[in-house]
Amino acid sequence: EHADNLGEELIAICVHILSHLPGIVDGKICVLTDDKGAASKIDSAVKRTNVQNRGAKIILFSTPKVVQHMFQEQIEISENEMVNIISQGTSGNIVVMGTTAYDFDINVSISMPSEALVGKIMEPNGINIIF
């Protein structure tokens, strides 16, 4: 169902179980989703877990955040490839949560075309994508 959150809860349970496997260190498990609602539900399910039962820390990435992370880690990727990855599955502007050079607070709806977003990602101090 579109209105329920069963899928997100199941993902959270699976991620929680995986985070307890031997050899799993913080940041080894990454959930990639562009659904801000799903990410929020997964995050809150993990945070609701008692501290002693949490397991390894999980990373939640959106597609634009993955592209920014790849660029920052100097993974060989062209500008056209970045635009192609970011624009997959969407039409129109890309909406991200983040900060730009002179922001004091997190802006939850930075909206721009994928080409402009890639330009900001490549620009020093252009944008810090949170999700």
Segments the model singles out, each with a brief description of its role:
Residues 1-29, 36-131:
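Active-site-proximal, substrate-binding regions of enzyme catalytic domains
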